[in-house]
Amino acid sequence: MGNSFTCISHEQEQRPKKSSGGGGNNSGKYKYVRRLSLMPSFRRRTLLPSLSCSGSSSTSSSKKGGIKAKTKKIRERHHHHHQDHEKDSHIIQEQTLAATNLLFNQTPRNSNSVVPPSFRRSTSVVYPSAQPSGTSSGPVSAVQTPKKSSAGFVRSSSSRQRSSTDPMIKPNQLVDKELNKVEGSETKRFVLVHGGGFGAWCWYKTITLLEKHGFQVDAVELTGSGVSSIDTNNITSLAHYSKPLLHFFESLKPTEKVILVGHDFGGACMSYAMEMFPTKIAKAVFISAAMLANGQSTLDLFNQQLGSNDLMQQAQIFLYANGKKNPPTAVDFDRSLLRDFLFNQSPPKDLALASVSIRPIPFAPVSEKVHVSEKNYGSIRRFYIKTMEDYAVPVLLQEAMIKLNPPEQVFQLKGSDHAPFFSRPQSLNKILVEISQIPFKKSS
């Protein structure tokens, strides 16, 4: 049999087969075929013993007796093993119960007790309170946990002790440090006005950064811009285009002031609102915006540089909703030139956002002349932020506006395209915060 263990099947076939010789000495004998199951051998053997009927019966009986004896021994061995396993499990349970009782008896049962250190998750305190005056007796001393009134917080799952180099700055001091930057500001509320074709969506980075400094920020969406349902071709005046901004100022309290910030054509809307609500505007900030003088229109301003700005001429698409015999009703942008014209320094994700969000600019407000006075418009402190890599409103055009209508102070954003809220949001935020802190100059 080799290394295989053989078991005899309970079913046996005894097929009498006649000798091929037919008669003679082999006529009274038969050959028996037995089916044997071999485990764990993977092959089946077929034995063909030539046995008589009487010999086969005695051999089969003896083998059956041997199998029964082996089966009985296996069952007895398994029964003893099961009893030993139950005995071991019972001993383990008794030992566990004894250890639990011992631990319970050694732990003090009062309200001030603490969990033994061996069962306590290790922690370290960044700002630890005063050390306990005493420790418990015994080989293991109880560790007092920090109280809620202590100036600190628990650092989870760390047993590192505090080092002398660890700063003692509390979490709330980080916020206070940021808020200290705007303590000297006259107002803590910004109002943001988007440029032509843009919407309130373009200020999402600036809003986030200013709010982190503790400012309240409002982004106004002008008529026919962003999510406005009004058709741009139907806007016929600067007052109509600026209506949401005017409504905002009307809703302010009489003594409330804001810092007004405008971009691009939003500068013309700012000038219109500054003339109407001078007492509600603490400061006005023009970001590459149309800072118009009295009697000037945005179209007049851009016509000064239109001949030298080939990219602007290529990017602009005039719309004639009333027919080409009449003036244009709106100006759209060639989407394929947006990157080169407006967003040459902006991230691709912001370019993608602008590509699906920009709308046409109403032409009537662009061609309308603005009338401002020194008493109202001139009483508001103005600041200008130049964008130094701007191809839509080139630096020369920005400087021409500054020279014609000088502000109190001029700032520069290096590396910024026409959309600094995309290309240089951190730098823009820094300048806005700085402007909010500039105090009034004392008259000599």
Swiss-Prot record:
Sequence ranges of Low complexity compositional bias: 49-64, 149-164
Tagged with keyword Signal: no
Cite the InterPro entries for this sequence: AB_hydrolase_1, AB_hydrolase_fold, MES/HNL
Out of the domains of life, which is the source?
Answer: Eukaryota
Any one GO MF term held by the record is: hydrolase activity
Q: Which gene encodes it?
A: MES13
What GO cellular component term, any one, is given?
Answer: chloroplast
Q: What is the lineage of its organism?
A: Eukaryota, Viridiplantae, Streptophyta, Embryophyta, Tracheophyta
**Residue stretches making up the AB hydrolase-1 domain:** 190-310
Which residues catalyse the reaction?
Answer: 264, 390, 418
**What are the entry keywords?**
Chloroplast, Hydrolase, Plastid, Transit peptide
Instruction: Quote the function comment for this protein.
Output: Putative methylesterase.
Composition skew (Basic residues), residue ranges: 65-82
**Where is the secretion signal located?**
none
Identify the EC number(s).
Answer: 3.1.1.-
Where does the record say this protein resides? Plastid, Chloroplast
**Which coarse location class describes where this protein primarily resides?**
plastid
Name under which the protein is recorded: Putative methylesterase 13, chloroplastic
Question: What residue stretch is labeled transit peptide in the record?
Answer: 1-60
Q: Which Pfam families match?
A: Abhydrolase_6
Write out the ranges of the annotated region (Disordered).
1-32, 49-90, 124-176
